[in-house]
Protein backbone atom coordinates (compact mmCIF):
# COMPACT_ATOMS: atom_id res chain seq x y z
CA UNK A 1 0.00 0.00 0.00
CA UNK A 2 1.12 3.54 -0.71
CA UNK A 3 -0.11 5.05 2.53
CA UNK A 4 2.01 4.83 5.63
CA UNK A 5 -1.08 4.40 7.77
CA UNK A 6 -1.93 1.18 5.92
CA UNK A 7 1.29 -0.51 6.94
CA UNK A 8 1.84 0.86 10.43
CA UNK A 9 4.56 -0.87 12.41
CA UNK A 10 2.05 -1.88 15.08
CA UNK A 11 -1.24 -1.99 13.18
CA UNK A 12 -4.52 -1.83 15.06
CA UNK A 13 -7.88 -2.84 13.65
CA UNK A 14 -9.33 0.65 13.99
CA UNK A 15 -6.54 1.95 11.74
CA UNK A 16 -7.33 -0.47 8.91
CA UNK A 17 -9.42 0.72 5.96
CA UNK A 18 -11.37 -1.85 3.87
CA UNK A 19 -10.97 -1.46 0.11
CA UNK A 20 -14.73 -1.39 -0.52
CA UNK A 21 -17.68 -0.68 1.78
CA UNK A 22 -21.39 0.04 1.41
CA UNK A 23 -22.79 3.37 2.52
CA UNK A 24 -25.20 2.56 5.36
CA UNK A 25 -27.41 5.54 4.44
CA UNK A 26 -27.65 5.37 0.63
CA UNK A 27 -26.48 1.75 0.11
CA UNK A 28 -24.11 3.01 -2.58
CA UNK A 29 -20.91 1.05 -3.14
CA UNK A 30 -17.93 3.21 -2.19
CA UNK A 31 -14.24 2.45 -2.58
CA UNK A 32 -11.17 3.62 -0.70
CA UNK A 33 -9.51 6.44 -2.61
CA UNK A 34 -6.75 6.97 -0.08
CA UNK A 35 -5.84 7.06 3.60
CA UNK A 36 -3.37 8.90 5.78
CA UNK A 37 -2.65 10.53 9.11
CA UNK A 38 -3.97 13.92 10.13
CA UNK A 39 -2.52 16.27 12.69
CA UNK A 40 -2.79 19.78 14.03
CA UNK A 41 -0.13 22.32 14.89
CA UNK A 42 -0.58 23.18 18.56
CA UNK A 43 1.79 25.64 20.21
CA UNK A 44 4.20 25.27 17.30
CA UNK A 45 4.32 21.46 17.37
CA UNK A 46 2.67 19.18 14.78
CA UNK A 47 0.83 16.37 16.55
CA UNK A 48 -0.86 13.40 14.84
CA UNK A 49 -4.37 12.83 16.14
CA UNK A 50 -6.35 10.82 13.62
CA UNK A 51 -6.19 8.33 10.75
CA UNK A 52 -8.38 9.33 7.81
CA UNK A 53 -9.77 7.23 4.98
CA UNK A 54 -11.58 8.93 2.08
CA UNK A 55 -14.09 6.77 0.22
CA UNK A 56 -15.68 7.65 -3.13
CA UNK A 57 -18.87 6.37 -4.73
CA UNK A 58 -18.18 3.90 -7.52
CA UNK A 59 -19.41 6.30 -10.23
CA UNK A 60 -16.46 8.57 -9.41
CA UNK A 61 -14.51 6.61 -12.01
CA UNK A 62 -16.53 8.18 -14.84
CA UNK A 63 -16.09 11.64 -13.36
CA UNK A 64 -12.35 11.45 -12.70
CA UNK A 65 -10.74 8.80 -14.89
CA UNK A 66 -10.66 10.53 -18.27
CA UNK A 67 -9.28 13.79 -16.89
CA UNK A 68 -6.64 12.60 -14.43
CA UNK A 69 -4.22 10.12 -15.93
CA UNK A 70 -1.07 11.96 -14.87
CA UNK A 71 1.86 10.72 -12.87
CA UNK A 72 2.07 10.90 -9.10
CA UNK A 73 4.37 13.93 -9.11
CA UNK A 74 2.04 15.83 -11.45
CA UNK A 75 -1.11 15.12 -9.48
CA UNK A 76 0.50 16.05 -6.17
CA UNK A 77 1.11 19.56 -7.49
CA UNK A 78 -2.27 19.92 -9.21
CA UNK A 79 -4.84 21.53 -6.92
CA UNK A 80 -7.61 21.03 -9.48
CA UNK A 81 -7.20 17.25 -9.08
CA UNK A 82 -8.13 17.47 -5.40
CA UNK A 83 -10.81 20.09 -6.03
CA UNK A 84 -12.46 17.72 -8.53
CA UNK A 85 -12.57 15.06 -5.81
CA UNK A 86 -14.05 17.55 -3.34
CA UNK A 87 -16.70 18.93 -5.71
CA UNK A 88 -17.35 15.78 -7.74
CA UNK A 89 -21.00 14.71 -8.28
CA UNK A 90 -20.66 11.53 -6.25
CA UNK A 91 -21.01 10.48 -2.63
CA UNK A 92 -17.96 10.74 -0.41
CA UNK A 93 -17.38 9.22 3.00
CA UNK A 94 -14.66 10.35 5.40
CA UNK A 95 -13.79 7.79 8.06
CA UNK A 96 -11.64 8.91 10.97
CA UNK A 97 -10.17 6.89 13.84
CA UNK A 98 -8.16 8.33 16.68
CA UNK A 99 -4.43 8.03 17.33
CA UNK A 100 -4.19 10.44 20.25
CA UNK A 101 -6.73 11.80 22.70
CA UNK A 102 -8.15 15.20 21.85
CA UNK A 103 -11.14 16.80 23.54
CA UNK A 104 -14.30 17.51 21.54
CA UNK A 105 -14.13 21.31 22.07
CA UNK A 106 -10.42 21.53 21.17
CA UNK A 107 -10.80 19.39 18.07
CA UNK A 108 -13.92 21.15 16.82
CA UNK A 109 -12.37 24.59 17.33
CA UNK A 110 -9.33 23.75 15.20
CA UNK A 111 -11.42 22.14 12.46
CA UNK A 112 -13.87 25.05 12.33
CA UNK A 113 -11.06 27.60 12.18
CA UNK A 114 -9.69 25.84 9.10
CA UNK A 115 -13.12 25.62 7.47
CA UNK A 116 -13.89 29.30 8.06
CA UNK A 117 -10.49 30.35 6.72
CA UNK A 118 -11.15 28.44 3.49
CA UNK A 119 -14.70 29.74 3.05
CA UNK A 120 -13.51 33.31 3.51
CA UNK A 121 -10.64 32.83 1.05
CA UNK A 122 -13.01 31.71 -1.73
CA UNK A 123 -15.70 34.26 -0.90
CA UNK A 124 -18.44 31.84 0.14
CA UNK A 125 -18.73 32.70 3.83
CA UNK A 126 -22.22 34.19 3.92
CA UNK A 127 -24.94 34.10 6.56
CA UNK A 128 -25.98 30.56 5.66
CA UNK A 129 -22.39 29.33 5.99
CA UNK A 130 -21.94 31.11 9.33
CA UNK A 131 -25.00 29.29 10.66
CA UNK A 132 -23.88 25.95 9.19
CA UNK A 133 -20.40 26.22 10.71
CA UNK A 134 -21.85 27.17 14.10
CA UNK A 135 -24.15 24.15 13.99
CA UNK A 136 -21.29 21.91 12.91
CA UNK A 137 -19.17 23.14 15.80
CA UNK A 138 -21.95 22.49 18.31
CA UNK A 139 -22.49 18.99 16.98
CA UNK A 140 -18.77 18.23 17.04
CA UNK A 141 -18.60 19.31 20.66
CA UNK A 142 -21.43 16.95 21.50
CA UNK A 143 -19.43 14.04 20.08
CA UNK A 144 -16.71 14.21 22.71
CA UNK A 145 -13.76 12.77 20.84
CA UNK A 146 -12.05 10.87 23.65
CA UNK A 147 -15.19 8.69 24.03
CA UNK A 148 -15.37 7.88 20.32
CA UNK A 149 -13.20 5.39 18.46
CA UNK A 150 -14.49 6.13 14.98
CA UNK A 151 -16.16 9.18 13.39
CA UNK A 152 -17.72 9.37 9.95
CA UNK A 153 -18.74 12.24 7.68
CA UNK A 154 -20.90 11.50 4.65
CA UNK A 155 -20.97 14.08 1.88
CA UNK A 156 -23.77 13.85 -0.67
CA UNK A 157 -23.59 15.44 -4.15
CA UNK A 158 -26.42 17.81 -3.21
CA UNK A 159 -24.51 19.30 -0.29
CA UNK A 160 -25.70 17.32 2.73
CA UNK A 161 -23.07 16.57 5.37
CA UNK A 162 -24.05 13.63 7.58
CA UNK A 163 -22.29 13.19 10.93
CA UNK A 164 -22.05 9.97 12.91
CA UNK A 165 -19.79 8.25 15.43
CA UNK A 166 -19.11 4.84 16.92
CA UNK A 167 -17.36 3.43 19.99
CA UNK A 168 -16.09 0.45 17.97
CA UNK A 169 -14.70 0.02 14.45
CA UNK A 170 -18.05 -0.54 12.75
CA UNK A 171 -19.41 2.10 10.36
CA UNK A 172 -22.48 3.63 12.05
CA UNK A 173 -25.77 2.72 10.37
CA UNK A 174 -27.56 5.91 11.44
CA UNK A 175 -26.40 9.51 11.30
CA UNK A 176 -26.42 11.57 14.48
CA UNK A 177 -27.12 14.81 12.61
CA UNK A 178 -26.95 16.47 9.20
CA UNK A 179 -25.79 19.87 7.97
CA UNK A 180 -27.49 21.09 4.78
CA UNK A 181 -24.98 23.52 3.30
CA UNK A 182 -22.87 22.57 0.27
CA UNK A 183 -20.10 25.12 0.86
CA UNK A 184 -19.63 24.09 4.50
CA UNK A 185 -19.74 20.40 3.57
CA UNK A 186 -17.06 20.84 0.91
CA UNK A 187 -14.91 22.91 3.28
CA UNK A 188 -14.51 19.94 5.63
CA UNK A 189 -12.81 17.83 2.94
CA UNK A 190 -11.00 20.89 1.56
CA UNK A 191 -9.18 21.32 4.87
CA UNK A 192 -7.91 17.74 4.58
CA UNK A 193 -6.78 17.56 0.95
CA UNK A 194 -7.06 21.08 -0.45
CA UNK A 195 -4.58 23.92 -0.83
CA UNK A 196 -3.67 24.08 2.87
CA UNK A 197 -4.20 20.42 3.69
CA UNK A 198 -3.77 19.17 7.23
CA UNK A 199 -3.09 15.67 5.88
CA UNK A 200 -0.31 15.70 3.24
CA UNK A 201 -0.06 11.92 3.71
CA UNK A 202 -3.67 11.54 2.57
CA UNK A 203 -3.03 13.74 -0.49
CA UNK A 204 -0.03 11.64 -1.50
CA UNK A 205 -2.04 8.46 -1.15
CA UNK A 206 -4.93 9.76 -3.26
CA UNK A 207 -2.51 10.85 -6.00
CA UNK A 208 -0.81 7.44 -5.99
CA UNK A 209 -3.87 5.19 -5.76
CA UNK A 210 -6.61 6.84 -7.80
CA UNK A 211 -5.00 6.79 -11.27
CA UNK A 212 -4.43 3.03 -10.99
CA UNK A 213 -7.85 2.36 -9.49
CA UNK A 214 -9.65 4.41 -12.11
CA UNK A 215 -7.93 2.97 -15.17
CA UNK A 216 -10.46 1.19 -17.34
CA UNK A 217 -10.93 -2.37 -16.19
CA UNK A 218 -8.77 -2.01 -13.07
CA UNK A 219 -11.46 -1.16 -10.53
CA UNK A 220 -14.64 -3.18 -10.23
CA UNK A 221 -16.99 -3.23 -7.26
CA UNK A 222 -17.04 -6.67 -5.72
CA UNK A 223 -13.45 -7.61 -6.67
Swiss-Prot record:
Coiled-coil stretches noted in the UniProt entry, renumbered to this chain: none
GO molecular function: chalcone isomerase activity
Residues annotated as site: Important for catalytic activity: 107
EC number: 5.5.1.6
Keywords in alphabetical order: Flavonoid biosynthesis, Isomerase
A biological process from GO: flavonoid biosynthetic process
Segments crossing the lipid bilayer: none
Record has Lyase as a keyword: no
Keyword Isomerase: yes
Family assignment from sequence similarity: Belongs to the chalcone isomerase family.
Function: Catalyzes the intramolecular cyclization of bicyclic chalcones into tricyclic (S)-flavanones. Responsible for the isomerization of 4,2',4',6'-tetrahydroxychalcone (also termed chalcone) into naringenin.
Protein name listed in UniProt: Chalcone--flavanone isomerase
Annotated source species: Pisum sativum
UniProt lineage: Eukaryota, Viridiplantae, Streptophyta, Embryophyta, Tracheophyta
Amino acid sequence: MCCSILHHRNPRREHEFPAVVTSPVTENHIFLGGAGERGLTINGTFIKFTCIGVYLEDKADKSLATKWEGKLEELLETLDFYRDIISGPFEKLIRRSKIKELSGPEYSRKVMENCVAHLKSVGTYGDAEVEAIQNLQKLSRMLIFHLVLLKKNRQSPDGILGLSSSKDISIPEKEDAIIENKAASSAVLETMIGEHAVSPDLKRCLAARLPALLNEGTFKIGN
